């Protein structure tokens, strides 16, 4: 069993940024954890990156590769903000069905595919 096993098998939907602002309706931002990887939607573009955890609660996300669809307005701003925060992630916490990535305190709720 690896430290990130509890994150796998679910689609994590971003529900709130660190400042409490919600994600734009109709433009879901998602994260799916697989062995050594994270992928999902930034709201406009699909992305993937390496992801590793040396111990429970620790997280390292590598450089993000994403499709290059044009993304204007609030959706584009949210996507850029999400990608920047995701690349800086150093830890995670699971509590009552919610995933929080930090620093940056992005909060996700899980759905099963």
Task: Report each predicted region and the residues it spans.
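Lipid interaction determinants
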Residues: 1-113
